[in-house]
Amino acid sequence: MTEQVNSDTTSDTTTTITTVYISNLPFTASERDLHAFLNNYGASSVLIPTQTVRRFSKRHNSNPRKPLGIAFAQFANNTLALKAIQDLNGTVFQNQKLFLKLHVPYEADSTPDTDVKKPKEKNKVKKTPETAADTVYCHDLPDDITDSEIRELFQLYSPQEIWIYRSKVYRRKCIPFAPHQITAALVTLQSETPIGDICDSVAKTATLRGKSIIVKPAYVSKIQEIKQLVKDNLTNARDPPPAALAEPAPAPAPAPVEPAEQVQEGQDNAETNDVPPPPASSSDRPTVAAA
């Protein structure tokens, strides 16, 4: 059923087409020459598309417009266009065979709505981290800040626990600058006042060493991170890693072993405490007569 509808649509379209597409046109042919060639078939206008080709040499740039070897001829009605195609298709024009057909304009197929992909949402809603209801975050504190100074700052809200720590911060994300350390603190309060009102009140009225401070509700994830770091530090301090085993001392070198005869002679001398007799002289030796 669909193919039949498409064929009917195509046939209806071709009956209304009055433009003829001509290919294999000689590059030397002009629009005037082609119009004279089609004049007997009622061609109202002729168009030969060209392209502009520019070169570095001035000698070759005298005529930068180059024809594409095709043409479009407009006729008064579809009947004249079909007549021209029937009679002139395959005929020779300026030593080249021409090919003619109806020019059917290109139409893109319509895409069903089901296949259209939805555009991605550019402005996605960022997920806000969860904040604690009883803990505030103090930012950019002096490096030598003490626990007592922070307690005095939040004395109206009964501070319970205070964690002072240092962290690295990057000022700009697009430029790879080296990070700098800041001193911050997490303060757990015991008050019925909403945590947002406490932050606004302290940030507007309180000062620390003559400078205003930044106070915000603390993120739950940051509180858990700091508590885990404190727990790990306490565990490492309580159970230090075992020291490296000392290398065993080298064994003493064995005493030199004397020959058995020297040992026996030494033992005999030690027992008698006598000096060994001197070796016999040549006069004491027996004389051997010559044969």
Swiss-Prot record:
Name of this protein: Regulator of rDNA transcription protein 5
Positions with biased composition (Pro residues): 239-257
This protein's record includes keyword Transcription regulation: yes
Swiss-Prot/TrEMBL keywords: RNA-binding, Transcription, Transcription regulation
Residue ranges of domain RRM in the record: 18-105
Pfam families: RRM_1
SUPFAM superfamilies: RNA-binding domain, RBD
Lineage of the organism: Eukaryota, Fungi, Dikarya, Ascomycota, Saccharomycotina
Record function comment: May be involved in the modulation of rDNA transcription.
Highest taxon of the lineage: Eukaryota
PANTHER family: REGULATOR OF RDNA TRANSCRIPTION PROTEIN 5, RNA RECOGNITION MOTIF RRM DOMAIN CONTAINING PROTEIN
InterPro entries in the record: Nucleotide-bd_a/b_plait_sf, RBD_domain_sf, RRM_dom, Rrt5_RRM1, Rrt5_RRM2, RRT5_SRSF_SR
Keyword Plastid: no
Recorded family membership: Belongs to the RRT5 family.
Species assigned in the record: Saccharomyces cerevisiae (strain Lalvin EC1118 / Prise de mousse)
Gene: RRT5
Molecular function in Gene Ontology: mRNA binding
